Amino acid sequence: MQSERQKHIRNFCIVAHIDHGKSTLADRLLEHTGTLTHREMEEQVLDNMEIERERGITIKSQAARLIYKRPEDGQEYILNLIDTPGHVDFNYEVSRSLAACEGAVLVVDATQGIQAQTLANCYMAVDHGLEVVPVINKIDLPSARPDEIKNEIEDVIGIESSDAPLISAKTGLNIEDVLEAVVQKVPAPSGDEKGPLKALIFDSYYDSYKGVVCHIRIKDGTVKAGTRIKLMAANKEYEVIEVGVFVPNYLKVEELKAGDVGYITASIKNVRDARVGDTITEVNNPAKEPLLGYRPAISMVYSGIYPIDSSKYEELKEALEKLQVNDAALNFEPETSIALGFGFRCGFLGLLHMEIMQERIEKEFNLDVIMTAPSVIYKVKKTDGTLIEITNPTNLPEPTEIDYMEEPVVKAQIITPSDFVGAVMELCQNKRGTFIDMEYIETTRVMLNYRVPLNEIIYDFFDSLKSRTKGYASFDYELDGYMRTELVKLDIILNSEVVDALSMIVPKDRAYAKGRTMAEKLKEIIPRQLFEIPIQAAVGSKIIARETVKALRKDVLAKCYGGDISRKRKLLEKQKEGKKRMRQVGSVEVPQEAFMSILKND
């Protein structure tokens, strides 16, 4: 059912590939509808983390309420714009933002056309039953080819795009057309204002004054200050303190009704209790069942984080707790390493998420940290029949106890200019990928589908892909189960001590090559000591590669001019004894660069 009020509301989001101008378009819409004056405008208004602006990416979902007056009849419409992240790692964030909308504006760059994430995000919008409104951006560029792109959208995605607005978000050209298209094409929300309350949390973050602020989309019912609410997945009850809308800053209102997008605060202390995707209902008149689609965020990549200065352990713990308040996808538990001391094992959504967390710890909390090599979750079937999951290579059981191991696989979709198909296929082959199929999108561009082990992707797949295709390829992936593989644990032994932080799990047939390169890399990086340091790579008890860092030595014979050979021999023997003793007590520091360079090797 639809009320008169709801007919004038449109809830929509903007989806696009990275750098196709999504956040810029959002800025222009805010400016055009007078939500922000020209003076308040800054680039990427909705990206309010410093890191987001710096990298030009959107990490957290944001929302803004625009008031649009149609020129022809003067009708006022409330347009709720929900800005979504565009990166693979934050797919779940995108899916919840989509669930809060009825329509999606699909931005396509007029010079580049459809890219892998354009497709991924567009299919996601269609799966959520949204009306997709294509918009072609950057038509002010000399290399723009809007007509070809329109055909491409129709052929590849199958959306009618003959009347797609041609805009330039940078100069503000034809922005009015986008607003008009949203009003005409995006369906108005429906929902029972009198029914039991049902609201979807599509984002939540911690404010030091208000506690957790939940960004919500109300599907049914009404919520106002004083309402007693229950979070269905967390199974906790609270009393609402304040409700309001975003203009992008907070504006307090009396109540929010079905169809509205806004925020509530209810002195919730922890972001974990207000999980994104959870359903809010009323305690006295609860909804029968929650809204569909909630799932806890799943960590795909694990890594150890250690403070460089071990006395900063408590500070690191506080930093992680504060970041976790705002990021329900981050999880961590304490762990110790012989080489690095006390630290934490953290789970991330993917590599970008991991990099961003490391940057935020270093910038916002002023802590220097070491990150160990990222690892995925392996499943190990032991000989006694038990199945365990391994996130840290050091916890892998002895080879004699393992029946078989499985590693996660992803389905990768790569779109590349046809000149580079050979190079891309070679890369996927090198990364143990299996070919699924390929199809031509247009004469010059090809879409390749591969199954690739996740372990191969988390190191440097994206960088290699970009460098092999001169930066033209785009890439998207989704988890596709597990597959059985012959895997072994590769240990690095320095001065006859295993450095647990450098251990990694590798395919059996690649262990030798990997061990060789790691030993060579470490030889270059580890500073010379006064005694020689053997660097060994081992699988189980078998040494597969060895390099030696030569000792620095003092010339003890300098003071002997001529003289007896036995005198010289005595001095050399004495030096040798000293070196031997030093080697037994000396310890070797592994510099931070060692960890980084080992991740980056091909």
Curated annotation (Swiss-Prot):
Entry protein name: Elongation factor 4
Family classification: Belongs to the TRAFAC class translation factor GTPase superfamily. Classic translation factor GTPase family. LepA subfamily.
Function: Required for accurate and efficient protein synthesis under certain stress conditions. May act as a fidelity factor of the translation reaction, by catalyzing a one-codon backward translocation of tRNAs on improperly translocated ribosomes. Back-translocation proceeds from a post-translocation (POST) complex to a pre-translocation (PRE) complex, thus giving elongation factor G a second chance to translocate the tRNAs correctly. Binds to ribosomes in a GTP-dependent manner.
Organism taxonomic ancestry: Bacteria, Bacillati, Bacillota, Clostridia, Eubacteriales
Domain tr-type G: 7-190
Catalytic activity, EC: 3.6.5.n1
Keyword flag Magnesium: no
Catalytic activity field: GTP + H2O = GDP + phosphate + H(+)
Region forming the signal peptide: none
Membrane topology reported for the UniProt record: Peripheral membrane protein
Keywords tagged on the record: Cell membrane, GTP-binding, Hydrolase, Membrane, Nucleotide-binding, Protein biosynthesis
Cross-referenced PANTHER family: TRANSLATION FACTOR GUF1 HOMOLOG, CHLOROPLASTIC (PTHR43512:SF4), TRANSLATION FACTOR GUF1-RELATED (PTHR43512)
UniProt subcellular location: Cell membrane
Pfam families xref list: EFG_C (PF00679), GTP_EFTU (PF00009), GTP_EFTU_D2 (PF03144), LepA_C (PF06421)
CDD domains, sorted: EF4_II, EF4_III, LepA, lepA_C
HAMAP family xrefs: LepA (MF_00071)
Residue numbers binding GTP: D19, H20, G21, K22, S23, T24, N137, K138, I139, D140
Molecular function, one GO term: GTPase activity
GO cellular component: plasma membrane
One GO process term, biological-process aspect: positive regulation of translation
Keyword Hydrolase tagged: yes
